[in-house]
Each structure stands twice: as structure tokens, then as C-alpha cells.
Amino acid sequence: MARYLGPKLKLSRREGTDLFLKSGVRAIDSKCKIETAPGQHGARRGRLSDYGVQLREKQKVRRMYGVLEKQFRNYYKEAARLKGNTGENLLQLLEQRLDNVVYRMGFASTRAEARQLVSHKAVVVNGQVVNIPSFKVRPEDVVSVREKAKKQARIGAALELAEQREKPVWIEVDNNKLEGAFKRLPERSDLSAEINEQLIVELYSK
């Protein structure tokens, strides 16, 4: 499946919630009619079946983290093999993606922008350049912006935006050095309450 390259707000309208695909901290409902489905007249949201609700939740989370269908299914399989709660394991695996960590540290305005920084070899992990967005960051790993990329205007703009967002408690960042440490795996209470990961578990358990 190819990565979606169309209007970002359309995806948020389709899911009926902000997927944080656009930069900035302005509420998305001030940018578009989030409660109205995409389309010229805004298709009516019909009553979904249980399967439909589960599918929508999976699509919402998959798009939020910018993960393709096959990748997402593989993350679920890995989460199911791990000890503990499968849904929480899934969210932790998604949070460990390097592109997500770069975004969480405030070095990029969106996960898509973070993915681009990583792909363009602008990110270093434990002193080594890593250009794989799905690279798994582990506790105590140090992530930084490569020296020659530190003067990029978009990174400075992203840091300013990050100051207006709630800072992740599982990450420590030195904005002066453009360096951060992934201190621990996030607990479920650290993450968005708008995600219902149990619906995803139910979907894949069929």
C-alpha cells in the first residue's frame, strides 16, 4: 500500500478527530469542520457496526503514527508476543519509532516532517547516523540532530511549536544541544486518552 500524499486535514475529518498531521497548536476545528466527513457536501456519518468501529480506530491510530497497513499489522503481531497488555504494548512500539521520537522531542512539527529528517540523514542515535524512520529507539538511547542540520529553519520553528505542547514525561530534551534522551517506555496513562487500543486488539483477534 502506498503512503497517502493527499490533504492531511481530509484524513482527520474522515476519522472525526485530530490526527496531528498538520503543524501548529491551533485547534484543528478552527482549520476545518472536523465533525463533517470529507466531500463536497460532507457525507453523513452513518451508524457503524462493531467491526466498523474497530476498523476506524485502527485506521485512526495507523494514520496518526504514519504507518502503512503491513507495518501496523506487524507491530500488532510483535505486541501480541510480548508479555503484558497487547494494546499497551502496541502503543509503546509505535512510540519507539525513531520518527515519532524525533517528533516528541520537538525537532519536527509533525511526524511526517520527522520522517523526512530521519530519511535525509539529519538524525543521530547514540552517535551514529540513522536514516530508517521505523528504527526502534530503546530506553536510555540518545537522539540528536546532526551538526550540519542544526541550522535548518524548520527545526527552529518546530522547537517553538513544541514549547506550546505538553512535554512527554518519558523523554528529556536539551534544546540548546538539540539532543534528547528516551528515558523509559511511556506508560498508558502518559498517552492520549482518545485512543482506544482495545478496539484494535478486538479487530485483529477475529
Curated annotation (Swiss-Prot):
* Occurrences of domain S4 RNA-binding (ranges): 96-157
GO molecular function list: rRNA binding; structural constituent of ribosome
**What protein family does this chain belong to?**
Belongs to the universal ribosomal protein uS4 family.
What this protein is called in its record is Small ribosomal subunit protein uS4
Keyword rRNA-binding, does the record have it? yes
Listed A to Z, the keywords are: Ribonucleoprotein, Ribosomal protein, RNA-binding, rRNA-binding
The opening ranks of the lineage are: Bacteria, Pseudomonadati, Pseudomonadota, Gammaproteobacteria, Alteromonadales
Biological process terms in GO annotation? ribosomal small subunit biogenesis; translation
Q: In UniProt terms, what function does this protein have?
A: One of the primary rRNA binding proteins, it binds directly to 16S rRNA where it nucleates assembly of the body of the 30S subunit.
**Which PROSITE patterns does this one have?**
RIBOSOMAL_S4 (PS00632), S4 (PS50889)
Q: List the disulfide bonds.
A: none
Q: Which GO terms describe its cellular component?
A: small ribosomal subunit
What quaternary structure, including any partners, is listed in this protein's UniProt entry? Part of the 30S ribosomal subunit. Contacts protein S5. The interaction surface between S4 and S5 is involved in control of translational fidelity.
Q: Which NCBIfam families match?
A: PRK05327.1 (NF003717), rpsD_bact (TIGR01017)
| Pfam families according to UniProt | Ribosomal_S4 (PF00163), S4 (PF01479)
